[in-house]
């Protein structure tokens, strides 16, 4: 049961919906069908999700008129979960959505993000946002020795500013520094990249794909 305040005109709902990959997905979907306000759907690209049929996923979301936008979020390993999904697998899954023949009746946020990155309008660094932890401290996303994400707590805003200033050199490898998308790629938080064998969390492969597709369309329309 939703609080009546959620049904006011200036509200919209953000719903995590991973289809059958998450418990009680049928109940979540039924609630989405009954929602009188717009819904922004977030899908976590877990191993179960990326194995699903994309055309069927789009068809089901199209059937829910309240869904106005859909974003596929990459899975990042942490202390609680360690699913095996590579960055390259995430890229390939998003490409399936981009190439799907079923028309989307909703806004596909990932497409917008790709366009913003290619236009160098997206800031990939953490200098424009900061988290507040349950302990009342400032928080930034860091990665431990096993490359699992965690929140690093900072006592003061000055400490956060110092951390953000050091991020481009401390958290970014030579692979990142030599990349043409550096500073504007699709990463939510920079992490150390050793090589591009399985892609990177800036999703260079996805940006390369989109740029090539754009050039191909331009040539075919010339």
Identify the residue ranges that each predicted region occupies.
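Short acidic, gly/pro-rich beta-turn/loop elements at beta-sheet edges
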Residues: 25, 51, 80-82, 189, ...
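Flexible mid-to-C-terminal extensions adjoining Fe-S/redox cofactors in radical SAM and related proteins
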Residues: 145-222
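Acidic carboxylate-rich catalytic motifs and surrounding loops in phosphoryl-/glycosyl-chemistry enzymes
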Residues: 44, 109, 188-191
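A structural signal for well-ordered alpha-helical scaffolds and beta->alpha junctions
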Residues: 25, 54, 86-94, 172
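A short, structural micro-pattern
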Residues: 7-9, 124, 173
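Radical SAM/AdoMet-radical enzyme domain recognition
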Residues: 1-77
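A C-terminal junction/extension of Radical SAM enzymes
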Residues: 66-69, 75-148, 182-184
């Amino acid at each position: 049961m939703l609080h009546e305040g959620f049904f006011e005109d200036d509200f919209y709902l953000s719903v995590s919906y991973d289809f059958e990959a998450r418990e009680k997905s049928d109940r979540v979907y039924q609630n989405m069908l009954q929602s009188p306000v717009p819904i922004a759907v977030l899908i976590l690209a877990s191993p179960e999700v990326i194995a699903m049929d994309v055309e069927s996923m789009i068809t089901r979301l199209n059937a829910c008129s309240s869904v106005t936008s859909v974003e596929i979020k990459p899975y990042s390993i942490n202390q609680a979960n360690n699913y095996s999904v590579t960055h390259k697998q995430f890229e390939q899954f998003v490409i399936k959505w981009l190439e799907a023949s079923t028309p989307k009746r909703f806004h596909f946020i990932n497409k917008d993000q790709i366009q913003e990155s290619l236009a160098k309008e997206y800031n990939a660094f953490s200098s424009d946002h900061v988290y507040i932890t349950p302990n009342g401290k400032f928080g930034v996303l860091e990665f431990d020795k096993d490359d699992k994400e965690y929140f690093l707590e900072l006592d003061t805003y000055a400490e956060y500013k110092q951390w953000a200033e050091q991020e481009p050199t401390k958290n970014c490898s030579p692979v990142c520094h030599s990349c043409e998308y550096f500073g504007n790629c699709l990463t939510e938080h920079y992490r150390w990249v050793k090589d591009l064998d399985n892609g990177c969390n800036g999703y260079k492969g996805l940006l390369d794909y989109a740029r090539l597709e754009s050039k191909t369309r331009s040539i075919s329309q010339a």
